[in-house]
């Protein structure tokens, strides 16, 4: 590059991190790495045209344990339900905001999941590929249980952490999932 243009590259860093293969080199030059994450609920609200003063009012009510005005409460419940279905992936959110077509939203979500699975096949070591994919595909069942602790027996009957823990770690390292550790509500 001769410096006349800024170039932005995106994508999986699994190949660069060296999963399953010798680490590949990163092009030399001015490089800034920015870790990107899905939109959180507040960002989802912004994308849906909810302005900052409204969000601040909601935060103030919640922080001070005050009643949220009825109209705001109704709208936030609706948006929270939509967020739980749409999620925070930018392309999915943009499609939802611009079209409100759930069939298009679901197709983009399926495409994202397929690309995650393709990365597993491309970058994981051969001996780990099936276990990683099994762990990944068990996530919906894991999340639908009342007990939210990851249970290896749901991945495969009789399975243990010693067999699958590395697979789950691979999925987290890939940025596909992130662990949430809950603590008891403090009163």
What residues fall within each predicted segment?
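Structural recognition of the conserved hydrophobic beta-strand(s) that form the central parallel beta-sheet
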Residues: 6-12
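Short regulatory helix/loop adjacent to the ATP-binding pocket of P-loop NTPases
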Residues: 16-31
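Amphipathic alpha-helical segments of the small helical/lid subdomains adjacent to P-loop NTPase cores
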Residues: 34-91
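Accessory nucleic acid-recognition modules appended to NTPase machines
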Residues: 98, 102-186
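Conserved nucleotide-sensing/catalytic segment adjacent to the nucleotide-binding pocket
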Residues: 1
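Hydrophobic/aromatic beta-strand patches that form the interior of the parallel beta-sheet core
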Residues: 8, 32-34
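Conserved nucleotide-binding/hydrolysis micro-motifs of P-loop NTPases
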Residues: 12-17, 39-42
């Amino acid at each position: 590059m001769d410096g006349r243009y800024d170039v932005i590259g995106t994508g999986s860093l699994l190949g660069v991190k060296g999963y399953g293969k010798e680490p590949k080199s990163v092009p030399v030059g001015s490089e800034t790495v920015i870790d990107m994450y899905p939109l959180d609920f507040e960002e989802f609200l912004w994308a849906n045209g909810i302005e900052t003063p409204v969000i601040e009012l909601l935060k103030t009510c919640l922080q001070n344990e005050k009643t949220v005005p009825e109209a705001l409460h109704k709208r936030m419940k609706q948006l929270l339900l939509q967020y739980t279905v749409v999620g925070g992936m930018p392309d999915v959110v943009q499609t939802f905001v611009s079209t409100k077509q759930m069939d298009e939203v679901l197709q983009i979500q399926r495409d994202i999941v397929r690309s995650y699975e393709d990365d597993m096949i491309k970058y994981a070591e051969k001996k780990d590929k099936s276990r990683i994919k099994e762990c990944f595909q068990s996530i919906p069942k894991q999340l639908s249980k009342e007990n939210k602790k990851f249970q290896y027996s749901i991945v495969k009957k009789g399975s243990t952490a010693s067999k699958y823990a590395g697979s789950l770690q691979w999925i987290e390292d890939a940025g596909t999932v992130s662990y949430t550790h809950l603590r008891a509500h403090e009163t």
